[in-house]
Structure formats: C-alpha cells, structure tokens
C-alpha cells in the first residue's frame, strides 16, 4: 500500500539579504513538521527556495554593482549552506528564475485565464518597496519633513500610478465556498485574529 503523502513549504525567500534568524526559524519549523510527518510514516515533500523577483532584489543587486541574475546566483550558496548547517532535510530547492518554475507559472496562469478567473485592470496605490506592500493613504504616517512614510518600517512610500494594465484574480468567484470551508474548518487559519481578518 502506498504511503500517504504530505507537503510542507517554506516561503520562498527574497535574496536581497543573506539568511538570518527569521528565515532560519521559519525553515526549522517547516523541517520539524516534515520530520514529524515522516516519523508517522508519511511520504513528505519539503520545498524551499529563493524568490528572485521584485524591486527589492533589483535594488540590492544595483547597490552591489551587479545585474539581478548575477546577484541571485551569488546568493544561492548562502541559502543552501545555511540549510545544510542546520540539517534541514528539504526535498526540493526552487528558484523562481529556473525554467521549470517559469513553465509551471505559465501553465497555471493559462488555466486561470481559460477558466475566466483573470481580468485586466489598473491599480493605483502607495507602495513601500521595503515591505512590498500597498497601503491606503489613510494608513500612512508623515515623517518630520511631512513626507508620507510606511507605518511599519517608516521608509518613504511611492505613489504607484500608471496606465499600465495588470491582471487580477477574481477572488469574488470563490468567496462563498471559501467562507463555507473556513466555517467548517475553523482551525484552518490560525491564529483566530488572522482568520477573522480574512473572513471580514
């Protein structure tokens, strides 16, 4: 009889900095769950890796006088060596610049498009590159110079407004099925404060 399968993933870590206590903590937690499930006889896959896209990565590469791909390539050993030093037993290490990742994303997007779950639109908002988050103007703070800053990291934010079209996911198509699922499985999103945030 085949073993029951179980999947564990870490975030795919941004390569704007070397692994640190936060990345180690998260990866150790994922590895602990993996070992526990393996000890219970399951066939477990633990996937980790690097997210090599984003403005933060491009800015960090430029700060080091490197092209983004060269910077990302230089960071891979730091992550692999850190996980080896911590005896992390991952089964796959994914890089978002790998051809296999690009192909998977293209296939996934095509399925969403074919099912009508994507639509084009424009987005405008205040963006913090460091936090990689958009904020409503009412959520921002002003620094001593009167400039709008991120409420979390206190760095300046940028108004991202362009006529550029973006693709959006029709989450509204799934609203009721998701709410029904969360009601039937109240422990699916933890802690409760995060569940309440999602369902409100």
Question: Each predicted region: which residue ranges?
Answer:
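N-terminal, positively charged nucleic-acid-binding surface of large information/translation enzymes
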Residues: 1-200
């Amino acid at each position: 009889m085949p073993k029951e399968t179980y999947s564990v993933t870490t975030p795919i870590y941004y390569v704007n900095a070397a692994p640190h206590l936060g990345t180690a903590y998260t990866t150790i937690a994922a590895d602990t769950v993996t070992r526990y499930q393996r000890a219970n006889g399951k066939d477990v896959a633990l996937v980790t890796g690097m997210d090599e896209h984003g403005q933060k990565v491009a800015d960090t590469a430029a700060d080091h006088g490197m092209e983004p791909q060269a910077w990302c390539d230089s960071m891979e050993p730091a992550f692999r060596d850190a996980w080896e030093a911590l005896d992390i037993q991952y089964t796959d290490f994914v890089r978002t610049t790998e051809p296999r990742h690009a192909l998977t994303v293209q296939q996934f997007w095509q399925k969403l498009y074919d099912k009508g779950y994507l639509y084009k639109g424009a987005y405008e908002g205040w963006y913090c590159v460091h936090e990689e988050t958009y904020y409503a103007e009412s959520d921002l703070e002003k620094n001593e110079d009167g400039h709008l800053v991120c409420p979390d990291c206190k760095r300046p934010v940028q108004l991202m407004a362009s006529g550029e079209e973006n693709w959006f996911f029709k989450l509204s198509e799934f609203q009721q099925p998701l709410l029904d699922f969360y009601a039937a499985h109240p422990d699916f999103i933890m802690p409760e404060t995060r569940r309440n945030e999602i369902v409100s």
